[in-house]
């Protein structure tokens, strides 16, 4: 199959592209510039220069494709720089769907996010809007909702690498966030980190499995972990002992209200809200359907952090 990827040069795409090639498919990448494809096997990929805001480049990228995968996602928006959830996570999907309709491409796979909802944060709302647009516009769609994703970053932003840099390697104690005024349950909210190798295989295998069409799948690791357990596992993976102290979420949100418009501030109010909501899955049906045995989140599976 010829598979066009929108956002294929990011972290998730950098793992999906070689998985596509290994499965005998031909990836076609929409690329802003050659540097964005660093580390990818570009000699085995077709390339189209342009951005998701360019309808001409989108049309060229999807023309003649058997399937399109949309992977663009951002963790924070900076409206003053023209970087918004609505534009990249919703309007970009709309523009890509329009290009697919014009080119007669009916197979569309979307990377959404676990926990999306119509009345949540701006991030969650834009992802939900994208899902609804895909369902309304594409006859053969599949949506994946991964939890937080871990794995070798390959020079890109990755969950555990960022936590190591911002928290584990910091001289400050690691924050165990808690709601309210008392530190009851500090750091107890749960996430279910999913391995990037499993996410990549889910996307690739779904392309040739008609039974995945018209369905939304959650992708989580096999065992939820508390925030405290996640930080402890990352610290152990890099042979560090880390002091951890309860931290009131209200204090961090107050600081974020002043500074989260600046890229140097480590977390936004919405990010903290979503983090403390937890991120686990109620449905693991994708794995048996696609023949995937999900990898656990352990010290051994985080050995790549030692290279950081």
Predicted regions and their residues:
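NAD(P)H-binding glycine-rich loop region in Rossmannoid oxidoreductase-like domains
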Residues: 35-95, 99-102, 114-119, 207
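Conserved glycine-rich Rossmann-like NAD(P)H-binding loop of the short-chain dehydrogenase/reductase
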Residues: 25-32
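Conserved Rossmann-fold NAD(P)-dependent oxidoreductase catalytic core, especially the SDR/UDP-sugar
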Residues: 26, 74, 82-149, 153
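Alpha-helical membrane-targeting segments
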Residues: 161-192, 241-279
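N-terminal Rossmann NAD(P)H-binding glycine-rich loop of SDR-like oxidoreductase domains
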Residues: 3-25
